[in-house]
UniProtKB/Swiss-Prot annotation:
The lineage of its organism: Archaea, Methanobacteriati, Methanobacteriota, Thermococci, Thermococcales. Belongs to the peptidase M48B family. Binds 1 zinc ion per subunit. GO terms for biological process: proteolysis. GO terms for cellular component: plasma membrane. Its cofactor is Zn(2+). The active site is at E134. Keywords: Cell membrane, Hydrolase, Membrane, Metal-binding, Metalloprotease, Protease, Transmembrane, Transmembrane helix, Zinc. It comes from the Archaea. The keyword Zinc applies. This is Protease HtpX homolog. Disulfide bonds: none annotated. Pfam families: Peptidase_M48 (PF01435).
Length: 289
């Protein structure tokens, strides 16, 4: 892993740890701060070593063998070979909402996950385009930062919800400085926005890069563009409602569109702009669509 990635990963962990500790202090003073710091250390450790298992468990994703999904495995193996990385494990998510994501701390410990809905609506070329995009995230080593951000942002949301509960049900110490109560209310409002902005910062530019790299790996930018249009349309009609919004930036298209996100804080670039860029890449490759 390059020095730049180590630095980015360290800064991300430090910032999110600080956010967790700050919220912990506002909830429970010094004791809350110590508990939050302990939780942060625990989450940092597990988000690095077991991030893939954590994210897969959130979506009940199941690792499938070559016997269970031979065609899918063949596609993943071919594209991984073309990208020059080890073949990732393959998982299927039991939801009809079409989407895909990659996770894992390194190319040697990566997983490509696709939903049942994706397998239903895409043809083979489109599926290759999507998987090439996800393999690009693995090749570019985006998956480590994406997954750590998802796990720690999820922890922040749990703490924020606990803080909200403590205010609503009177668990917060009323004898403490009223300024802390105001600060806690502000933290409840602003912490989720901060977590979303972090996801936005690490996601948008990397999505463009994964589109470009994936198009070159598969040689089918037109197929990826077609897949993005299909996924976008399906997500607008039926957004994912049972997942964890902290993982939105990990998917090829934000699956929570229309639920709690607005375009200003979208974790992904507009699909129309991504398709336009893919058109330019296709023209450079001598492909017109």
């Amino acid at each position: 892993m390059g020095i730049g990635l180590w630095v980015r990963t360290g800064l991300l962990m430090a910032f999110l740890t600080g956010l967790l500790v700050g919220i912990g202090y506002l909830i429970g003073g010094q004791g809350g701060m110590i508990i939050a710091f302990t939780i942060a250390l625990f989450m940092n450790f597990f988000s690095y070593w077991f991030s893939d298992s954590i994210v897969l468990s959130w979506y009940n994703a199941r690792i499938v063998s070559e016997e269970e999904a031979p065609e899918l495995h063949r596609i993943v193996e071919k594209l991984a070979m073309q990208a020059g990385i080890p073949k990732p494990r393959v998982a299927i998510v039991p939801t009809l909402v079409p989407n895909a994501f990659a996770t894992g701390r390194s190319p040697e410990h990566a997983v490509v996950a696709v939903t049942e809905g994706l397998l239903r609506i895409l043809n083979r070329d489109e599926l290759e385009g999507v998987i090439a995009h996800e393999i690009s995230h693995i090749k570019n080593r985006d998956t480590l930062i994406q997954t750590i951000a998802a796990v720690l942002a999820g922890a922040i949301m749990v703490l924020v919800n606990f803080a909200r509960w403590s205010l609503w049900f009177g668990a917060y110490d009323e004898d403490r400085d009223g300024g802390n109560i105001v600060a806690l209310i502000l933290a409840i409002i602003l912490a989720p926005i901060a977590a979303t902005l972090i996801q936005l910062a690490i996601s948008r530019s990397r999505e463009y890069l994964a589109d470009e790299t994936g198009a070159k790996i598969s040689g089918k930018p037109h197929a990826l563009a077609s897949a993005l249009m299909k996924i976008e349309e399906a997500v607008r009609y039926r957004p994912l409602k049972n997942g964890n919004p902290a993982t939105a930036h990990m998917f090829i298209v934000n699956p929570f569109r229309g639920v709690d996100f607005v375009e200003l804080f979208s974790t992904h670039p507009p699909t129309e702009k991504r398709i336009e860029r893919l058109r330019k890449i296709a023209m450079e490759m001598g492909i017109i669509f």
